[in-house]
Amino acid sequence: MDEGLWAWRQTENHNHMIEMQEKLPAPAADGAVELAFFGGSAFRITSPSGLTMMIDPWRNPPWGTWNWYLYDFPKVAVDIALSTHAHFDHDAVHVLTANVILDRLIGTYEFADVKITGIADKHVSDSKHNAYDWAEMTRRLTPMKTNPPDNCRSFDNCLLIIETGGLRILHWGDNRPNPPDSVWDKIGDIDIVLLPVDGSYHVLSAAQADAVAERLQAKLIVPHHYGIWDVTTRGSTLLPPDEWVNGRKDSIWADGGSVKLTADFVKQQSGRVFCFGEHVAFDKPIARGTGA
């Protein structure tokens, strides 16, 4: 009874949503879309009209035996908070100051110049390509069922498609690489895919990431779910994505934690990787201290 959402204690309000509610521009409105990286699998997307969305904010494991992150997720206010699935490194929507929370969305939500579609599928449950084979360890060491169709809730995954600024942006979450054809059909054409790729190949192997990118034919591929030395702990086992990124043709390394993308620029690309690397869109607390 003492746990749960704490919005009742927040001093903020949803006046920004009331203002935007009166305008209701079309989802295809022109203008740049800002993509900001917050480490882990967390991205803030800002539509041309100024609607802000945070997908997959992270937290440390609630059982407290070890940490994945060196500090708490930054204090951020957004209009809409979203999560792809119920794992600690993706589900911390409660730490945000958000006007709307869409946790594991299945179906469609539309507001202002944004349309969000959630497609139900399954989390990766075969991790033999990873050095630690964490999925097999989970099955052996815990009562948790990871294999579909009888998996536990935390091994569901919702693919999230954000449509705004003339772009269709897909957040893959930790989805399996081989969803059924019916899911691929629902995904449709994608301009930008946010894909989980790291040097340990925790979620997708290099070959799986390449295959997903090829199947989607996305214009830009943005890696996430990778290790950053001053964000993630060594205990996470995550590694930087450099090997995979540098193995792709004409990859772009960002020079900051956010970028503004226009439909004209994105649609001129063809399977090009855009990686934020160690850059994030907040001041890293450890960088202001004395070191790790």
Name what the model sees in each region.
Residues 93-120, 209-227, 244-252:
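P-loop/Walker A phosphate-binding loop and immediately adjacent motor/lid segment at beta-alpha junctions
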